[in-house]
From Swiss-Prot:
It catalyses: Endotype eliminative cleavage of L-alpha-rhamnopyranosyl-(1->4)-alpha-D-galactopyranosyluronic acid bonds of rhamnogalacturonan I domains in ramified hairy regions of pectin leaving L-rhamnopyranose at the reducing end and 4-deoxy-4,5-unsaturated D-galactopyranosyluronic acid at the non-reducing end. Pectinolytic enzymes consist of four classes of enzymes: pectin lyase, polygalacturonase, pectin methylesterase and rhamnogalacturonase. Degrades the rhamnogalacturonan I (RG-I) backbone of pectin. GO terms for biological process: cell wall organization; polysaccharide catabolic process. Its EC number is 4.2.2.23. InterPro entries: Carb-bd-like_fold, Gal_mutarotase_sf_dom, Galactose-bd-like_sf, GH-type_carb-bd, Polysacch_Lyase_4, RG-lyase_II, RG-lyase_III. It is found in: Secreted. Glycans are attached at N22, N27, N109, N142, N238, N284, N432, N492, N532, N594, N635. Residues 1-20 form the signal peptide. Belongs to the polysaccharide lyase 4 family. The gene is rglB. GO terms for molecular function: carbohydrate binding; rhamnogalacturonan endolyase activity. Keywords: Carbohydrate metabolism, Cell wall biogenesis/degradation, Glycoprotein, Lyase, Polysaccharide degradation, Secreted, Signal. This is Probable rhamnogalacturonate lyase B.
Length: 660
């Protein structure tokens, strides 16, 4: 049953039978309630009050705080827009699903009249559950302006305004007390969206986690992120604990595959559906764009004395695309664009893995495209699953269509790729194949582990020893470290004797600094890195060709995260040059403007991947000592619109030299 309502009507009360799931409507609000959870919606399409067992989870509404979950975007010609701000129309739907469980839903319909962009936000509450099932839709039909812009951000937010919440968490390693009001009031800006709490050294966040705070510290890759949220430890709620979680029970309508990383929680619990953070690709909004994202689930739990880990475990138990499939099939008639299980199939397979492969993963994305680029087709779906040690995998609930299968694994250079994987509804597609790893001869040496991350190097995943919660160092803030102390003479690495964890940095800067503790700007020791290695006569005997492979876990050109070519910037495309011994001509790896990502400056060691295999005559090498010089342009910077370092940089995943 669907009720299209104008909230100027007189008060109306409806109930689904004689149960505890009720819907009430007034001239200004809609209320969904079951035995434990009550959500009150404004006529502009926001949750403005939310109660679990009578506990106010949001606090008072004040501007954009004390509300949510709600939908906003950076997607209009003017930039940011909150759905419901122009022509909101609210609908109520209700019924009983295939399991016999009653549900009720609220649907916001809004058209942004300057462009005709159509927004829909869906919230569903089921009897017996303490959370809201969410779908979000954007449609654009405009032949007059067939290209509008990119969909730069599309997100839902739970944005409380209360001292109930005491901790934020996106993983076991990324759990910390929320900074106090005093710390926030006395914080010092050190970078865009990054602050220092040196004026409140007794604050719990400062003493336990870090001196610096940025929302990017709690960002995660979608491969690893299933739930994130806020925790109330009971100190402000008479000993009763609560949790507010975004549960990513499905990930097939996001973009970027398992390497996509994004913001999760910073006092706000986000569902970042689309963004270009960390250089991720975003779809273009063109005539005919029509995409429904979801479902995801905002879970609110607690009401007793459960610990953070116990409440998180409850949330994690729901982070499974098999959860509530019958319910989602039942409400598909209400949700424009949602694909029911009758039009979904499975892919089952085994890929013989190369020797040394660990943590293998199987990925389905749009056919014919690199998996991080699947946003080029806004209609595309994506799926992945961890493979077992024998290369076996199964992917279920896959929307029918044609896909590319990609497999990658730690320890192996390159990927396995297979196009044309056809999936049909209620059918199983079977694949058996062997992954032949790329090879250009005999491997002489490698530096780093090919795992699509620069985290194994200095100030990467190593744990901070100075705070009791020991967060990984890369998550904090690049300016917390000092290049001139770490590498006073630059990087001079020797294969076989140097330690990658201490002698090779997680980022290769063109320029370093200034930082809060060091006003100097250094560009003499940063741009050239030396890698020394020895070769024997036997290794070079009868060898004609050498191949240098460089895999980057991220690279920042003058284009930053935008994928926009900037003709006035000399480094909008960036050349990383490799010099072999005394050769005057370099091997050049050109990093394109559309491959750029703001990675380490946004607390990340894995962003948009870039790689190159470059050949050169083996006689450039010599018996005995050899040197590879990795060269970035000296003092290469761009103009930044925000308070961010202007330097270009690259982050190495792994390098290797082969001879044939």
């Amino acid at each position: 049953m669907r009720l299209s309502v104008s909230l100027g009507l007189a008060s109306l009360w409806t109930a689904i039978g004689a149960t505890a799931l009720n819907v009430s409507q007034t001239n200004s609000s809609i209320t969904l309630a079951n035995d434990r959870l009550t959500a009150i919606f404004s006529n502009a399409g926001k949750v403005v009050d939310l109660y679990l067992d009578g506990q106010d989870l949001l606090g008072p509404a004040s501007g954009s705080t004390g509300v949510g979950p709600y939908l906003d975007c950076y997607c209009t010609p003017k930039g940011f827009y909150t759905a419901g701000s122009t022509t909101p129309r609210m609908e109520v739907v209700q019924g009983t699903d295939a399991t016999g469980t009653q549900y009720a839903g609220v649907i916001l319909n809004d058209t942004y009249t300057p462009t005709g962009q159509q927004f829909q936000q869906y919230w569903f509450l089921r009897d017996g559950e303490t959370g809201l099932h969410m779908f979000s839709r954007l449609a654009y039909y405009n032949e007059t302006t067939p290209f509008l812009r990119n969909l730069q951000e599309f997100r839902t937010l739970f944005r409380p305004n209360t001292d109930l919440w005491t901790h934020l968490t996106s993983s076991e390693l990324q759990t910390a007390p929320l900074p106090s009001d005093e710390a926030v009031g006395k914080q010092v800006v050190v970078q865009d969206a990054t602050w220092r709490f040196n004026n409140t050294p007794n604050d719990a966040y400062y003493t336990q986690f870090s001196e610096y705070f940025t929302k990017y510290t709690f960002s995660n890759a979608w491969r690893d992120n299933n739930v994130h949220g806020l925790y109330a430890d009971g100190s402000t709620s008479n000993g009763t604990t609560f949790g507010a979680w975004l549960v990513m029970n499905t990930k097939d309508t996001y973009y970027g595959g398992p390497l996509h990383s994004d913001l999760t929680v910073d006092g706000i619990v986000y569902n970042y559906i689309v963004s270009n953070h960390h250089g991720e690709g975003t779809p273009n909004i063109t005539n005919g764009f029509d995409r429904t994202f979801g479902p995801q689930f905002y879970l609110f739990n607690g009401g007793g004395s459960s610990s953070l880990n116990e409440l998180r475990s409850e949330a994690e138990s729901l982070a499974d695309p098999s959860w509530n499939v019958e319910f989602y099939d039942s409400i598909a008639k209400h949700v424009v664009g949602y694909v029911p299980s009758s039009k979904r199939g499975s892919v089952q397979g085994q890929i013989k893995l190369p020797r040394g492969a660990t943590r293998p993963i199987a990925i389905l994305t749009v056919d014919g495209q690199y998996f991080q680029d699947n946003s080029v087709d806004p209609r595309s779906y994506q799926y992945w699953v961890e493979m077992d040690a024998n290369g076996k995998f199964q992917l279920d609930h896959v929307v029918e269509g044609k896909y590319r299968l990609t497999v990658y694994a730690d320890g192996i250079f390159g990927d396995y790729v297979r196009d044309g994987v056809q999936v049909r509804g209620r059918k199983t597609t079977r694949i058996n194949d062997s992954w032949q790893p790329e090879s250009a001869g005999v491997e002489v040496w490698r530096l780093g582990t090919p795992d699509k991350s620069s985290g194994e190097f200095l100030h990467g995943v190593a744990r901070d020893p100075t705070h009791p919660l020991h967060p990984p160092e890369y998550l904090i803030y690049w300016g917390a470290y000092d290049w001139q102390q770490d590498f006073p003479n630059g990087v001079n690495y020797t294969i076989g004797s140097s330690d990658p964890a201490t002698d090779f940095n997680t980022v290769h800067w063109s320029v370093f600094g200034p930082t809060p503790d060091n006003p100097d700007v250094e560009y003499d020791t940063t741009h050239d890195w030396a890698i020394n290695f020895s070769l024997t006569k036997k290794q070079l005997q009868k060898r004609k060709t050498a191949t240098l492979t460089i895999q980057l876990a991220g690279a920042k050109t003058a284009s930053g995260n935008t994928d926009v070519y900037k003709p006035d910037e000399p480094y909008t495309n960036l050349a990383l040059e490799s010099y072999i011994n005394q050769q005057e001509e370099p091997l050049t790896m050109l990093i394109g403007f559309n491959q750029s990502s703001s990675c380490i400056v946004r607390s990340a060691v894995s962003c948009y991947q870039v790689r190159s295999r470059m050949t050169f005559p083996a006689d450039w090498l010599q018996v005995g000592s050899n040197t590879l010089t990795l060269h970035l342009p000296r003092n290469a910077t761009d103009v930044e619109d925000a308070i961010l370092p202007g330097t270009v940089y690259v982050q190495y995943d792994a390098l290797r030299l082969e001879l044939s």
